[in-house]
Amino acid sequence: MTASLTTKFLDNTYENPFMNASGVHCMTTPELDELANSKAGAFITKSATTLEREGNPKPRYISVPLGSINSMGLPNEGVDYYLSHVLNRQKKYPDAPAIFFSVAGMSIDENLGLLKKIQESEFNGITELNLSCPNVPGKPQVAYDFDLTKETLEKVFAFFNKPLGIKLPPYFDFAHFDIMAKILNEFPLAYVNSINSVGNGLFIDVEKESVVVKPKNGFGGIGGEYVKPTALANVRAFYTRLRPEIKIIGTGGIKSGKDAFEHLLCGASMLQIGTELQKEGVQIFERIERELKDIMEAKGYTSIDEFRGKLNSL
């Protein structure tokens, strides 16, 4: 019995549910091409701002024993760079499944401007609006402000009619899950992506008695194994609260087929990999695909739909 990882997401069919997390291995055209030619089912661009951004001073990304700490500050080549890349790729491979395009403006107005540019372009893929970057000094995460989130989405959907998902930060309280889900259910969202890194963690070099990243006095977003339980909880919480039309992309702590299986069991439709992709490179997709298939075949599953979202309670 052979397990299939074929994944239907919106109107697209992907060979498997795996993709990069925006921010990892997607800064430049060569990196994006490498993703496209890898075993990943899909890929997403670097979160784009209107103009090129250098980001925060280095060191700003450090691998630590169970994951990573980063305070990148949204370095990117600017929206026109990535839009040109995806439009060229659409023309070259018209039958390929949809590309994901990420934007992360520094303000509501910038986000609206970015989305208007995408709306007016020939881009026919899926857009992700990042409302949860924790690493830009002086810029709070929009998605922790429920009123501002609702205001943003009202303005976005007044004109934007292409498929749109949003990337959320982690939440830690049932009341916050309830409030955010109620807001999101009011809008024609394609998906939510849970989670972005756990913001404002601190990692210390004991020998130097120092922090390990330079920006924000060492405070940075935490990724990797550290965040998997939080990521799973957020995936599950939104899967059980959102309208079934709003899909879930699970992100956080995926480094093995077992981790992927857990995210899918909680209700995720697609899976993004960040920290472990940074450590291992694009060959990770082939390994995790094989490991997930092995788990499914051992359990007698032939497709992901047979177990997605079917997490048992005690």
Curated annotation (Swiss-Prot):
One of its GO terms (biological process) is 'de novo' pyrimidine nucleobase biosynthetic process. GO terms for cellular component: cytoplasm. It is found in: Cytoplasm. It catalyses: (S)-dihydroorotate + fumarate = orotate + succinate. PROSITE patterns: DHODEHASE_1, DHODEHASE_2. It comes from the Eukaryota. Its cofactor is FMN. Binds 1 FMN per subunit. Pathway: Pyrimidine metabolism; UMP biosynthesis via de novo pathway. The keyword Oxidoreductase applies. Substrate binds at K46, N70, S71, M72, G73, L74, N130, N196, S197. FMN binds at K46, S47, N130, K167, I195, G224, G252, G253, G274, T275. The keyword Ion transport does not apply. It is an enzyme of class 1 (oxidoreductase). InterPro entries: Aldolase_TIM, DHO_dehydrogenase, DHOD_1A, Dihydro_DH_chainA_dom2, Dihydroorotate_DH_1, Dihydroorotate_DH_1_2, Dihydroorotate_DH_cat, Dihydroorotate_DH_CS. Keywords: Cytoplasm, Flavoprotein, FMN, Oxidoreductase, Pyrimidine biosynthesis. HAMAP family: DHO_dh_type1. Catalyzes the conversion of dihydroorotate to orotate with fumarate as the electron acceptor. Homodimer. This is Dihydroorotate dehydrogenase (fumarate). It comes from Saccharomyces bayanus (Yeast). The gene is URA1.
